[in-house]
UniProtKB/Swiss-Prot annotation:
Protein name as annotated: D-alanine--D-alanine ligase
Cofactor note: Binds 2 magnesium or manganese ions per subunit.
Binding site for ATP: 179-234
Catalytic activity line of the entry: 2 D-alanine + ATP = D-alanyl-D-alanine + ADP + phosphate + H(+)
GO CC annotations on file: cytosol
Stretches that traverse the bilayer: none
Protein origin, superkingdom: Bacteria
Residues the record lists as binding Mg(2+) 1: 305, 319
Physiological role: Cell wall formation.
EC numbers on record: 6.3.2.4
Length: 360
């Protein structure tokens, strides 16, 4: 399969814009250039698509360093300045003219993992890596994920859903309902964001109102969810009709929980591969990972996140990431590396799975 042109889609309109650039840098560094011709496509925060020199300049940025030394707002301004007066690099969506044969989206969060970019690529008949439109949109929504998981016999944490209009019209009543149902600690989460953006761990009911306000600012649907005491583990799943699951990896958060800063800025979390669980639990996690992958109709790749509850040993699904991080500290490529599938081979397999996948 020589000289296949792969469009690397990165950036995007979500709050995970910078993380997408970091993932794209890793893919660019590890893709086999003797087999694939890389065509970078940078999507700015305002939705403009850039190719050529502009896309390559963004890809060359040390985003990790910028995020550590500056605020996200300052980094955003620098990215915006790089796209000013660069109309000659605007992409006109003529994929065929550019010779693009397959797309490799590393667009995390909204507009990337929710089925939107997948739908656009299907309109243009461009094969793409990862899950299809339906499974992407389902796994993006934490409530839908839980509903499908329960139907498949997979355990989930106790939760309730709060819709933004209901909360804004009935703040006191909804807060009282939450207080009666959940005892601290528990979580307040936007239903459709990733990388722990907007998540708050509630230790006291005094923190509830601010957490709900912030989550409602970010999403129209909010989850209130019981905090599970136990190990936080992840399983990498790869494949289409016959997926394989890695051994589980374990996250030991540096702070109260595995938040955005822990994941991408200070890297204070400790990762254990394999997870510190017995052989039986490890095998069950792999089985549950594949079961969840199939229950949500996933294809190509997904990272399945679980808790192993302290005391009971119950395996509880947390969430599914249809486009997991590909950064140097991301669990998905590290788990695949442990399974004997290096980064370059992983990219190759994902492209091959994209080309063989039957259209939805």
């Amino acid at each position: 399969m020589p000289n296949v042109t792969v469009a690397l889609l990165f950036g995007g309109k979500s709050s995970e814009h910078e993380i997408s650039i970091i993932s794209a840098k890793a893919v660019s560094a590890h893709i086999d250039r003797t087999t694939y011709t890389l065509f970078p496509l940078y999507i700015s925060r305002d939705g403009r698509w850039f190719k050529g020199r502009t896309a390559r300049k963004v890809l060359d940025l040390d985003i990790t360093g910028l995020l550590k030394s500056r605020t996200i707002e300052t980094t955003n301004r620098q990215l915006l300045a790089m796209t000013e007066n660069r109309d000659e690099d605007l992409f006109d969506f003529n994929f065929q003219k550019e010779g693009i044969e397959v797309a490799f989206p590393v667009l995390h969060g909204a507009y990337g993992e929710d089925g939107k970019i997948q739908g656009l690529l299907e309109v243009f008949a461009i094969p793409y890596t990862g899950c299809n439109v339906q499974s992407s949109s389902m796994t993006m929504d934490k409530e839908i994920t839980k509903l499908c998981a329960v139907q498949a016999g997979i355990h989930v944490a106790d939760y309730m859903t709060v819709l933004r209009p209901d909360y804004l019209n009935n703040r006191s009543a909804i807060a009282e309902t939450i207080k009666k149902r959940f005892a601290p600690p528990f979580f307040v989460k936007p239903a459709n964001l990733g990388s722990s953006v907007g998540i708050a761990k509630i230790h006291s009911f005094d923190e509830l109102e601010n957490a709900l306000d912030e989550a409602c600012r970010l999403d129209v649907k909010i989850l209130v969810e019981k905090a599970i005491e136990g190990r936080e583990v992840e399983v990498a799943v790869l494949g289409n009709e016959h997926p394989i699951a890695s051994v589980p990896g374990e996250i030991e958060p540096g702070g109260d929980f595995y938040d955005f800063t822990d994941k991408y800025i200070d890297g204070s979390a400790r990762l254990h591969i394999p997870a510190r669980v017995d052989a039986d639990t490890s095998a069950r996690l792999q089985e549950e990972g594949i079961k969840a992958f199939r229950a949500l109709g996933c294809s190509g790749m997904s990272r399945i996140d679980f808790f192993v509850e302290k005391g009971s040993g119950r395996i509880i699904l947390n969430e599914i990431n249809s486009i997991p991080g590909f950064t140097s500290i991301s669990m998905y490529p590290m788990l695949m590396e442990h399974a004997g599938i290096g980064f370059t081979e992983l990219i190759d397999r994902l492209v091959r799975f994209a080309l063989e996948k039957t259209p939805a």
